[in-house]
Amino acid sequence: MNPYETEIYKVVPIPNKGMGMIAKVKIPVGTRIFAETPLIRTKSDAKEIEEALSTKTKEEQEAFHRLFNAHPDTMGPFLGPFYSNALTIDETKGGMFLLGSRMNHDCSPNVKHTWNPRLDQVTVHAVRDIEAGEEILTTYIDLHKSHTERQKILLEHFGFKCYCSVCSVEERKIRKISDLRRKQLAYYDRTMAKMCIVNPRGALRALRHRIHIAHEELLFGRLDIIALLDAFRLCVIHGDFERASIFAKKGTKAISLYEGTDSEKYLKISKYVENPRSHALAEGVPALPLFLEEDDELSDLEDNLWGCKLEEDVYSDTD
């Protein structure tokens, strides 16, 4: 079996990018495109990489050395390719994936790669429909940064300037709006944990807005899961177990779509759909709805769930 070509994708040369992965057919959102076991896993130690590679087949060694090396002079022939191509396994280790390394970067990626410890593999899921002939693209960096910040990180760490659909926009106003949205997402990253404790109603509004502006930036998958699980935990902490159950259900649906039902996260959260009170954070918490009075203006079920109407995109009129 050729791992570089299946019924749904193939790895081919991409102009100005080296190799890349192209969809051969339309890939619906939620499709697991592939799962891959790491060739090497390490804490970025050159000697460890060299020793691990020596145990691999000649074909695997050659495939490793064909990978792009953004740091040949400073990191050498082993650490350089690893640093330039590895995907995160956990907080301490990265993994070298020969197939995964062929996915190029985009600042609004169409796939989400996730380490699945139960499978001991990285899984790659489509976060939106991918058309036949479209490149399959992941992200190498934290995308909640401005255009200038992203370009600096990509050039310094990965040796290239990004010309994706987000970065190639020339109109000043559109780029400024994108930067403002991503700056707001970064703010939510820093403040949401505290907000969920001290201002739960405001936090629910912010979580809904967080998902909305992420989608405006064509960022799907990761933040959907994070925001829904934050909303679930918020409701548990404050005793709104009816809402907690709904958010647990929404969260498991998002995890199923973007990571798979074999995800540890899915198995962990799904049990709270029927019994949110069994969560450790619910111990000793009295049942108390977050919104004691019905708001006549929130007749829509989603508005009622989040306790607010969906905010307009406040950045679209930015000068």
UniProtKB/Swiss-Prot annotation:
Biological role stated in the UniProt entry: Histone methyltransferase that monomethylates 'Lys-5', 'Lys-8' and 'Lys-12' of histone H4 (H4K5me1, H4K8me1 and H4K12me1, respectively), thereby controlling gene expression and remodeling chromatin structures. Monomethylation of 'Lys-5' of histone H4 (H4K5me1) is required for subsequent acetylation and formation of N6-acetyl-N6-methyllysine (H4K5acme).
Enzyme class: transferase
Protein's name according to its UniProt entry: Histone-lysine N-methyltransferase set5
Keyword NAD appears in the UniProt entry: no
Keyword Nucleus: yes
Domain of life: Eukaryota
Keywords: Chromosome, Cytoplasm, Methyltransferase, Nucleus, Phosphoprotein, S-adenosyl-L-methionine, Transferase
EC number, UniProt record: 2.1.1.-
InterPro entries linked to this entry: SET_dom (IPR001214), SET_dom_sf (IPR046341), SET_domain_protein (IPR053185), TPR-like_helical_dom_sf (IPR011990)
Occurrences of domain SET (ranges): 4-141
S-S bridge residues: none
Catalytically driven reaction(s): L-lysyl-[histone] + S-adenosyl-L-methionine = N(6)-methyl-L-lysyl-[histone] + S-adenosyl-L-homocysteine + H(+)
Organism, as annotated: Schizosaccharomyces pombe (strain 972 / ATCC 24843)
